[in-house]
């Protein structure tokens, strides 16, 4: 459908009081770039990716990108506690999580630390991690949807590996 609708608006959101639209073409590009990035960080078809986000355009792009990589989306509630996240990570065997905000990451990161399978955290917004262990790789959404050819810099400081 992206080819049919091109630059027509597909998704929209209000950020900082301003409306912002994402075209069909841009959404398709981000989906493909995310799928490529998930594969690049080591995910394989059939791997699970937990998605912790409120309704926003990135949620749909994440879901489609996960599926385009051949992986399985594990959607969760934004009201989950650390205990809930720990249970879902253990039960699903998710190898990565995508989380939208620092607020949601507060209950998620301790569960990721406890998980034996999950070692990738992708933050849609900036996620402050403090003293993150070497076993967890943190990635920023903007880098994941930029596509390999679009990356101008990779931030390799502690807690921002990706």
Model-derived features: where do they sit?
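Structured binding elements
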Residues: 70
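Conserved ATP-dependent adenylate/AMP-binding module captured primarily in the ANL superfamily
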Residues: 78-113, 142-143, 147-148
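Short acidic/polar active-site loop segments enriched in Thr and Asp
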Residues: 44, 95, 119
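ANL superfamily adenylate-forming
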Residues: 16, 105-162
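Conserved AMP-binding/adenylate-forming core of the ANL superfamily
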Residues: 10-64, 81-86, 137-143
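Conserved residues at the C-terminal ends of beta-strands
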Residues: 12-14, 95, 100, 124-125
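AMP-dependent adenylate-forming
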Residues: 1-23, 126-133
